[in-house]
């Protein structure tokens, strides 16, 4: 049996990102997965911190991480680590021809399947929400 430096379980967006980062660091990576992962059913959006503990929408996820409870998972790793991870993700996806738009420091509003909007950090370029801000009416067909 061949040995690996890193074993990743799951081939969703998080698993594939972890595999890319480890491989770029020179590690021999093996991915264990059953089926196609969540990429077949998910939109590929990257949420970071959309709402505060009190349910208020977050405009700047990095700033909100700095203000979060020390027990919050993002606070434990710190905003700069989250920022670096998101910048690495943006770099990898752009270099692979699947660019994302957005900023680690500013959430954008994305329409949901039930007709409302939710804050999210990064979205594939094919899901650019800027045109929605200028629209007077939005028609959803489905």
Where would I find each of the regions flagged by the language model?
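C-terminal catalytic lobe of FAD-dependent flavoproteins
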Residues: 142
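Hydrophobic, helix-prone linear segments
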Residues: 1-3, 11-16, 84-91
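Extreme N-terminal leader/targeting segments of oxidoreductases
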Residues: 1-6, 24-25, 37, 53-55, ...
């Amino acid at each position: 049996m061949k040995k690996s430096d890193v074993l990743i379980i799951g081939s969703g967006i998080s698993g594939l990102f972890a595999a890319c980062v480890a491989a770029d660091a020179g590690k021999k990576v093996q991915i264990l997965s059953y089926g196609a992962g969540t990429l077949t059913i998910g939109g590929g959006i990257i949420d970071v911190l959309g709402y505060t503990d009190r349910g208020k929408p977050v405009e700047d996820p990095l700033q909100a991480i700095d203000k979060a409870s020390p027990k919050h998972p993002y606070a434990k790793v710190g905003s700069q680590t989250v920022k670096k991870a998101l910048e690495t993700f943006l770099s990898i996806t752009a270099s692979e021809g699947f660019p994302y738009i957005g900023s680690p420091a500013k959430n954008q509003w994305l329409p949901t399947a039930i007709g409302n909007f939710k804050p999210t950090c990064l979205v594939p370029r094919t899901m650019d929400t800027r045109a929605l801000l200028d629209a007077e009416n939005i028609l959803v067909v489905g």
